[in-house]
């Protein structure tokens, strides 16, 4: 089957936003106007095409990123709809990793909200070009220019309108195109009849002012345009569009559009902007990776002629076809029935069938080409972030960063029959979602699940019940603490046992130093002269990793520590891997006496919105919860307070805020970083954990 759309005519985009900005409705309208669906599904009625899981339709939020393919103006647009709720951050991260561009949807009344900041920061990390769609222009309190100002103030983004709204709230009736300098007036409810007219006289001055600002902002990113602009020459519409495209693709400029997806206004113009300003796979730098045989860096340009290379970015269990692996093809061509090499795992995989996805319906295809996003059936060993490549041209692409879980719950099956089913269900859910961890407490035999927030675990327990028919009792949420060292030290681990026959002997000297935050555990072998034989070095590292999993203070995993093995000794007969593993763990225990071990707790960035008169209460809440205020701003009659507060202090806060503000206050929290707990709290945690032992 020949390629239907050239690479130049392919767009891989994500739709990202804060929860409730109207992102899923926007995607629905895109599917409607591109001819994928013939009746529009409203999210608040629970009928949305992209939100196909039962929980999504009940809760009206998007949990998994559904991928779909649509066509617009002779282009193929692959769309990934991502969740806006902070508990599902990994879904956003893995989507951004495989996208070339994104549409950031804002609620025009609120502008940039906490989760918008999170997804924006993630998109910046991955270098993803973006356009901004200020949605809900029909909503009471909608304010387009306020939304634009929040892009500058809260995100420091070089964002400028390429459109202006005509009217707002109930009176929102059209859009001014600042490039063509024409007005697009909507004359029917479905948004399919659009009249192009001259700009109404009362909007002309504003339109000219913002066109001038737009030209100036774009000219600043392009020397040739800047020269023309300074010399007073006219910049043509074509030059302006080309300048916007170039600056957007270079992530130097963010065009801002407006509309109301719910009222069917502005979505087609936004689709035009996706084609005009977001990159094709050819416009972005070629993907880099490491050749596992030579350790050399290699690139894979976007081309069907190059060897096949793809990244698996999502695993899903489908009730009809079983395990689905979503992947993005960066180079080459793949046919169903062929074999690929999973270079991350070193395993050969057979591609059974290839499916092009549309939310939860699917179309079987024979071939995928570079730049495509598709799903494969039949992969057994592949997990999120794995590289799939041609067996003769190996490459390991950069994987997906997985954030550490911050909250945990104990789950126990209600009956013996549920016991076996629960193990299978949890394993399948963990395969789909790398931020969901399942562990068994060795001493008590309890199953502990960890995730990114209460809603995250709630949804997973719910899925366990519905999809796998497992009934379970769930404990109260607990905070996922971590441990680390705050000082450097050197410590010996010496293990010797002699009891008839072959003995055990292991002797190591290890230097422990604090590592940078987020860098995890790093092991360095600095042995010279073979005082610890090479075959025992991995055992030393393994012994440390296993011991660090249970910490040195209160049984929590240790993070951000460097360990340098620099000396030791061995016995020709009695030394073994086991002996060196034990010696390494004894060295860690010894180090704990002088390395100032500390317990770390997750700190949340909490954004609280309350009426002016409740500001004092909120400041009191933050202080009482060991928090610190980071900033405040007024928005209408409300105050928005941003603060860093330990997660441990936030359980039950929704009820406290509700009663303090008579139900008018709201808050959002997102994990920000780990921080040392105060000494008094640390002692309490240690006592509590020792008591449980």
UniProtKB/Swiss-Prot annotation:
GO BP term, example: ribosome disassembly
Q: Which SMART domains match?
A: EFG_C, EFG_IV
Q: What does this protein do?
A: Catalyzes the GTP-dependent ribosomal translocation step during translation elongation. During this step, the ribosome changes from the pre-translocational (PRE) to the post-translocational (POST) state as the newly formed A-site-bound peptidyl-tRNA and P-site-bound deacylated tRNA move to the P and E sites, respectively. Catalyzes the coordinated movement of the two tRNA molecules, the mRNA and conformational changes in the ribosome.
Could you cite one Gene Ontology molecular function of this protein? GTP binding
Q: Which residues form the tr-type G domain?
A: 8-282
Where does this protein reside within or beyond the cell?
Answer: Cytoplasm
GO cellular component term, pick one: cytoplasm
Note the Pfam families from the entry.
EF-G_D2 (PF22042), EFG_C (PF00679), EFG_III (PF14492), EFG_IV (PF03764), GTP_EFTU (PF00009)
**In the UniProt record, does the keyword Nucleotide-binding occur?**
yes
What keywords are annotated for this sequence in UniProt? Cytoplasm, Elongation factor, GTP-binding, Nucleotide-binding, Protein biosynthesis
Name the family.
Answer: Belongs to the TRAFAC class translation factor GTPase superfamily. Classic translation factor GTPase family. EF-G/EF-2 subfamily.
Lineage of the source organism?
Bacteria, Bacillati, Bacillota, Bacilli, Lactobacillales
> Which sites bind GTP?
17-24, 81-85, 135-138
Q: State the encoding gene.
A: fusA
- The entry's protein name is Elongation factor G
């Amino acid at each position: 089957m020949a390629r239907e759309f050239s690479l130049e005519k392919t767009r891989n985009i994500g739709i990202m936003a804060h929860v409730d900005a109207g992102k899923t409705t926007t995607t629905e309208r895109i599917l409607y106007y591109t001819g994928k669906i013939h009746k529009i599904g409203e999210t608040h009625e629970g009928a949305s095409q992209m939100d196909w899981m039962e929980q999504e339709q009940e809760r009206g939020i998007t949990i998994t990123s559904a991928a779909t393919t649509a066509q617009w103006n002779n282009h193929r647009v692959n769309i990934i709809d991502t969740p806006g709720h902070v508990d599902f951050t990994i879904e956003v991260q893995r989507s951004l990793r495989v996208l070339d561009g994104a549409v950031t949807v804002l609620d025009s009344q609120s502008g940039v909200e906490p989760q918008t900041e999170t997804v924006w920061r993630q998109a910046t990390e991955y270098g993803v070009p973006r356009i901004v769609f200020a949605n809900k222009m029909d909503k009471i309190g909608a304010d387009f220019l306020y939304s634009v100002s929040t892009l500058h103030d809260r995100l420091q983004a070089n964002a400028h309108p390429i459109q202006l709204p005509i009217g707002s709230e109930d009176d929102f009736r059209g859009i001014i195109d600042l490039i063509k300098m024409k007005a697009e007036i909507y004359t029917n409810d479905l948004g399919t009849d659009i009249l192009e007219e001259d700009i109404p006289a009362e909007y002309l001055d504003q339109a000219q002012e913002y066109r001038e600002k737009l030209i100036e902002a774009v000219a600043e990113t392009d020397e040739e345009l800047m020269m023309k602009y300074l010399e007073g020459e006219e910049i043509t519409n074509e030059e302006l569009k080309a300048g916007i495209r170039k600056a957007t693709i270079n992530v130097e400029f963010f065009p801002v559009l407006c509309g109301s997806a719910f009222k069917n206004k502005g979505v087609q113009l936004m689709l035009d902007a996706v084609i005009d300003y977001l990159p094709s796979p050819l416009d972005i730098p070629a993907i880099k990776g490491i050749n596992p045989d030579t350790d050399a860096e290699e690139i894979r340009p976007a081309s069907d002629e190059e060897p096949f290379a793809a990244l698996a970015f999502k695993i899903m269990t489908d009730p009809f076809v079983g395990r689905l692996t979503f992947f993005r093809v960066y180079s080459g061509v793949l046919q169903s029935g062929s074999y690929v090499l999973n270079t991350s795992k070193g395993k050969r995989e057979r591609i059974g069938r290839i499916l092009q996805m549309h939310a939860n319906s699917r179309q079987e295809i024979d071939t995928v080409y570079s730049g495509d996003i598709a799903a494969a059936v039949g992969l057994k060993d592949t997990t999120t972030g794995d590289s799939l490549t041609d067996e003769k041209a190996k490459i390991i692409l950069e994987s997906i960063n997985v954030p550490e879980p911050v909250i945990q719950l104990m789950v126990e099956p209600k009956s013996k029959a549920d016991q076996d089913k629960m193990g299978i269900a949890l394993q399948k859910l963990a395969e789909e979602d790398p931020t969901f961890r399942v562990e068994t407490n060795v001493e008590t035999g309890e199953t502990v699940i960890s995730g990114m927030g209460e809603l995250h675990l709630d949804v997973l327990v719910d899925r366990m019940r519905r999809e796998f028919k497992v009934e379970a009792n769930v404990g109260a949420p607990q905070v996922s603490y971590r441990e680390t060292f705050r000082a450097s030290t050197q410590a010996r681990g010496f293990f010797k046992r002699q009891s008839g026959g072959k003995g055990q002997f292991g002797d190591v000297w290890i230097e422990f130093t604090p590592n940078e935050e987020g860098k995890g555990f790093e092991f360095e072998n600095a042995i010279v002269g073979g005082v610890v034989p090479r075959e025992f070095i991995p055992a030393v590292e393994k012994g440390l990793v296993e011991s660090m999993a249970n910490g040195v203070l209160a049984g929590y995993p240790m993070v951000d520590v460097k360990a340098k093995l620099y000396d030791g000794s061995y016995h020709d007969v009695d030394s073994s891997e086991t002996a060196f593993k034990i010696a390494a763990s004894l060295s860690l225990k010894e180090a704990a006496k002088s390395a100032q071990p500390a317990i770390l707790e997750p700190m949340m960035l909490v954004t609280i919105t309350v009426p002016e008169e409740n500001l004092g209460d909120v400041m009191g809440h933050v202080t009482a919860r060991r928090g610190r205020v980071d900033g405040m701003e007024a928005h209408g009659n409300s105050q928005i307070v941003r603060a860093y507060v330990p997660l441990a202090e936030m359980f039950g806060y929704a009820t406290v805020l509700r009663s303090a503000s008579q139900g008018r206050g709201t808050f959002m929290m997102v994990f920000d970083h780990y921080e040392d707990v105060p000494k008094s709290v640390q002692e309490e945690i240690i006592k509590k954990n020792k008591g449980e032992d």
